[in-house]
């Protein structure tokens, strides 16, 4: 599960204390494409404080401490970090610069030379038209000799678009693994209105033998038991929520615990699950 809008240290500690094994953080950029802060702003999900923020370098360093075995701050349950990139309005040049600079920031502040920090990252881009960000991000990792860290990186587009079109974009980027697909809407709108047709399509596509362009499917934002149970029934790999402890309680109910559990570090977030 992913705790949503984890944009400062206080809320990060709170969610980890609740038992979350994944977090989603919002990353803002300057007009030139420089990664600057964790910040969502208004509007955001209902019943949430939208203005939490911390500098990107400081945030990545803190995540590094939390996910490095042997560090006094190490939190064993934190496995996956979704970086929800706020790229709206950036030019293609700025997108290219943004991908390059985010790779640099991860190398400088998260892996910091020793590469012992063990979290996986999902680079979550809003629109397929912003795919240049992914291209330069991957290229820069190679050029700064952090290409081996690609094993810890996955990708996701969050525009709820036609996945056949999304597949073409991935093909153009040369990406055919470590792909997460998502479907969702703000918690202010009931799941009943959103429906689950697209989510069902994604899980069906994921499970097609030999299909390479979806490894995992997650749903957002699921804050009610009926929604979480529906997601489990559809076979999703993860849910984003504002209430991590609540989702864990649902998972631990006898009717679910025999079939589902929270992922641990022994599970690979880029491998398809087979029952």
Curated annotation (Swiss-Prot):
Recorded hits in InterPro entries, A to Z, give: PLC-like_Pdiesterase_TIM-brl
Q: Could you tell me the keywords of this UniProt record?
A: Cytolysis, Dermonecrotic toxin, Disulfide bond, Hemolysis, Lipid degradation, Lipid metabolism, Lyase, Magnesium, Metal-binding, Secreted, Toxin
Q: Top enzyme class of this protein?
A: lyase
What is its cofactor? Answer: Mg(2+)
Give the cofactor binding note: Binds 1 Mg(2+) ion per subunit.
Record: residues binding Mg(2+): 24, 26, 84
Cystine bridges: which residues? 44-50, 46-188
One GO CC annotation, please? extracellular region
Question: What this chain does, per the record?
Answer: Dermonecrotic toxins cleave the phosphodiester linkage between the phosphate and headgroup of certain phospholipids (sphingolipid and lysolipid substrates), forming an alcohol (often choline) and a cyclic phosphate. This toxin acts on sphingomyelin (SM). It may also act on ceramide phosphoethanolamine (CPE), lysophosphatidylcholine (LPC) and lysophosphatidylethanolamine (LPE), but not on lysophosphatidylserine (LPS), and lysophosphatidylglycerol (LPG). It acts by transphosphatidylation, releasing exclusively cyclic phosphate products as second products.
**Which family is this protein grouped under?**
Belongs to the arthropod phospholipase D family. Class II subfamily.
Q: What is this protein called?
A: Dermonecrotic toxin LspiSicTox-betaIE4i
Q: Where does this protein come from, organism-wise?
A: Loxosceles spinulosa (Recluse spider)
